[in-house]
Amino acid sequence: MSGRGKGGKGLGKGGAKRHRKVLRDNIQGITKPAIRRLARRGGVKRISGLIYEETRGVLKVFLENVIRDAVTYCEHAKRKTVTSMDVVYALKRQGRTLYGFGG
């Protein structure tokens, strides 16, 4: 052991950088039937064809904001793993309190 303690936050030997796959156009993974099911749950009977792209755009912006806040909480705590509590606090910060995930 090199005496760095929990997490090993020292400099280390460097190691190989991991290559991350560039993620793009994943918003299309939110399929038309998935959006339709969400609308049905909200009580919508009939859906315009233009709704699907608009919904994807709105969902993308919402998730970007929540994830940015959750990652900020995570970085402040000097962790590399985003926990459910980070997400709960991020949602609370935006005025959308979520119950049932601890805290």
From Swiss-Prot:
Protein's name in the database: Histone H4
Job of this protein: Core component of nucleosome. Nucleosomes wrap and compact DNA into chromatin, limiting DNA accessibility to the cellular machineries which require DNA as a template. Histones thereby play a central role in transcription regulation, DNA repair, DNA replication and chromosomal stability. DNA accessibility is regulated via a complex set of post-translational modifications of histones, also called histone code, and nucleosome remodeling.
Xref: InterPro entries: CENP-T/H4_C, Histone-fold, Histone_H4, Histone_H4_CS
GO cellular component, one term: nucleus
Main location: nucleus
Subunit composition and interactions: The nucleosome is a histone octamer containing two molecules each of H2A, H2B, H3 and H4 assembled in one H3-H4 heterotetramer and two H2A-H2B heterodimers. The octamer wraps approximately 147 bp of DNA.
Pfam families membership: CENP-T_C
Species the sequence originates in: Solaster stimpsoni (Striped sun sea star)
